[in-house]
């Protein structure tokens, strides 16, 4: 049996696993990814990519590629406009009796696309079937070992690493893999999570469901109107219609509404269900794929078990309402990747990896509850549930961390009710446009491959200390002084953060503020050295 030694083994080649491979290679970490299916997915239950996830993809050099392959979201209020181009889609969620009477549809949710004050990029509508190949190709380009049609057969961990056996499903060839760490991104039914015996909490199963991918010309009914999702409030035939791409759609329904989970749902029956629910019984449909799945709400009680980490659906699963699932998985992967890199490159102790659970578990728990609340509210419109909803922009960009990897942060919740990005530790750095060598750059773009010390005009001693520490410790740490290496004519950074003239922010590789000082210090190098030691768990 062949044997491979690799720093990180990633199990699962969906969005989370492929993103992990990209981010690990971006941080200079070798990895092997195994995925039991032959290729990336042909169907999508994830299309909405929020602005925060786009920031991560932007920093990996993928923003333009994703935009080129996306439907372009426009303001939801424009959904009634006739004759819209097929590649434009209003970001709106509707509830309608049937599609034939779409003019009477009620707006259930209309997320704002106006994020220019929050992010250097914006949300996109890019199906999982398009995004997975983008991530796969980028991971391969960066040097990741990606193996589809390969399954994890077994694994066992010890104090120093993980021993696994993988099997090529085509040839039956078995390979022993020794890794320092394992990322389980193997989905809702994660075999790794089950083998570890990790328990979870949540509302449990919400029912067996079917997704029907089909092609149809709805122009005679819609007259160019477009929307992201419409909940069909047809008492005899309820379901959800989602735009897939320019000429294809996905219709989802709970099996219990049509005879139970054991009933046969072939393409012919599914086509009839779609026609009935949409109220247009004679329209031609080309059903291309029917996929059963189970909607559930479950969050793992622990995201870490020794040298194994749960990410994406393996860690948290919830209804698709809000498009939080794939976004959360990609953000899990990014949070974990820079921490693994810090440990594997000898810059941090293994204890830094405990902050993955400390940070991502509260976020995953609260996002799962938001998704469940949105799902229930969209179905019945209960006002009490509506009052519990947090704006999508806040959920996407406003989550914050309380952990030992941020100093001075103690938040009662991971997701605030109102957006607050003010440069405090535990928050993503507020987006401010600055000028660097004649080029406009966002503060969000500064910390890509390492830490960044961002000082105001009188904070040069902080920047000088950072430069010395980078040289002596090997920690990737770049220093910028506003007014010297960066210019800020509008003084926007001070307005956004309230940072003092002699103050500085320390940004982590994920763009979150790890520490701040509003004043100078007698020995800035000693202070900053101690700060980094605490963040990287070296003390």
Swiss-Prot record:
So what does this thing catalyse? tetracenomycin B2 + 2 NADPH + 2 O2 + 2 H(+) = 8-demethyltetracenomycin C + 2 NADP(+) + H2O; tetracenomycin A2 + 2 NADPH + 2 O2 + 2 H(+) = tetracenomycin C + 2 NADP(+) + H2O
Give the record's pathway. Antibiotic biosynthesis
Alphabetic keyword roster: Antibiotic biosynthesis, Dioxygenase, FAD, Flavoprotein, Monooxygenase, Oxidoreductase
Miscellaneous note of the record: Since tetracenomycin B2, the most likely substrate for ElmG, was not available, tetracenomycin A2 was used as a substrate to test the enzyme activity of the purified ElmG.
Top enzyme category: oxidoreductase
Q: Give residues annotated as binding FAD.
A: 15, 35, 128, 152, 313
Tell me which family the UniProt entry assigns to this protein.
Answer: Belongs to the PheA/TfdB FAD monooxygenase family.
The residues annotated as the active site are: 231 (proton acceptor)
Question: Which species does this protein come from?
Answer: Streptomyces olivaceus
Q: Name one GO molecular function term.
A: FAD binding
EC? 1.14.13.200
Flavoprotein as UniProt keyword: yes
Report what the protein is called: Tetracenomycin B2 monooxygenase-dioxygenase
Looking up PANTHER family in the UniProt record yields:
BINDING MONOOXYGENASE, PUTATIVE (JCVI)-RELATED, TRK SYSTEM POTASSIUM UPTAKE PROTEIN
| Gene Ontology terms: biological process | antibiotic biosynthetic process
**Chain's role:** Involved in the biosynthesis of elloramycin, an antitumor polyketide. In vitro, catalyzes the triple hydroxylation of tetracenomycin A2 (TCM A2) to give tetracenomycin C (TCM C). Uses NADPH as an electron donor and requires molecular O(2).
Q: Does the keyword tRNA processing apply?
A: no
Q: Which cofactors is this protein said to need?
A: FAD
